Amino acid sequence: MFSSYSLCKCLVSFHILAIQVLISCASSLNLTNEYLNHKCRKYQPGSEYEKELNTLSRRVATLDFTDGFTHRSNSRDTKSVTIIFQCRGDSYRSKCNSCYATALAGFRSRCPRNKGGIIWYDQCFLDVSMINDNSPRRMNYDNIFSMHNPNNVRGNVNSFNKKTTEFLYKLIGKADRLDVDGINFLYYAAGEMRLGKQTLFAMVQCAKDILSCKDCLEWSIKELSKCCDGKQGARVVGTICNLRYELYPFLRT
């Protein structure tokens, strides 16, 4: 059985009007790592930049991804290379390493000889750039897009939208708080909620180096109202934060 997903909106620098991603549902738990989207920039083959990129990408591959995130740079002035990589909150350690390998291979395939680019998968994203800045990142509206399930909700659409939005805001409150040690922000929350005879599954997540997780996620919820009212599933995806809801389980528990 297949369900299709549509890339319904791209902001600023995306010139893709629509895309459909087929997600194979092999079991009741729909765990996939489908390619979602990408964007690229060019560089010269055999350049010093390419050598630095190869060096840094190999270094990142050796990480254990305990928290599923890294922001690393090779500082060489104009030859600087920065990699930002994050896994979905339920994918870490070996699963995160596997997603990094997939994302890196996908980046090299879709962005050959590119001086930076971003590629998104279900379970991770990879951002390669020349920006040598490890300071906390602000909201970036250039690299955000939304996707939705083409199927509409049956019944009271307004009630579904309202309850879904309220649940997402509840998850934001859980994600935008400190961990049990009171040191780091969690920046991830997931849960489920009964909606009559159906169950709503949802998650919210921010990058570990963002200045304001709450602001990014609240902005993303507003985007849902523009693209995805009454849809059985939807997501807003970026490199700063992302959120998703479905009427089927899609996360590891």
Curated annotation (Swiss-Prot):
GO CC annotation, single: extracellular region
Gnk2-homologous domain sequence ranges: 34-133, 141-250
Signal sequence residues: 1-28
Keywords linked to the UniProt accession: Repeat, Secreted, Signal
Principal location listed in the UniProt entry: secreted
Gene that this sequence comes from: CRRSP33
Location of this chain's protein in the cell: Secreted
Family of the protein in this entry: Belongs to the cysteine-rich repeat secretory protein family.
A Pfam match: Stress-antifung
PROSITE patterns: GNK2
UniProt protein name: Putative cysteine-rich repeat secretory protein 33
InterPro entries membership: CRR_secretory_protein, GNK2, GNK2_sf
PANTHER family: CYSTEINE-RICH REPEAT SECRETORY PROTEIN 34-RELATED, CYSTEINE-RICH REPEAT SECRETORY PROTEIN 38-RELATED
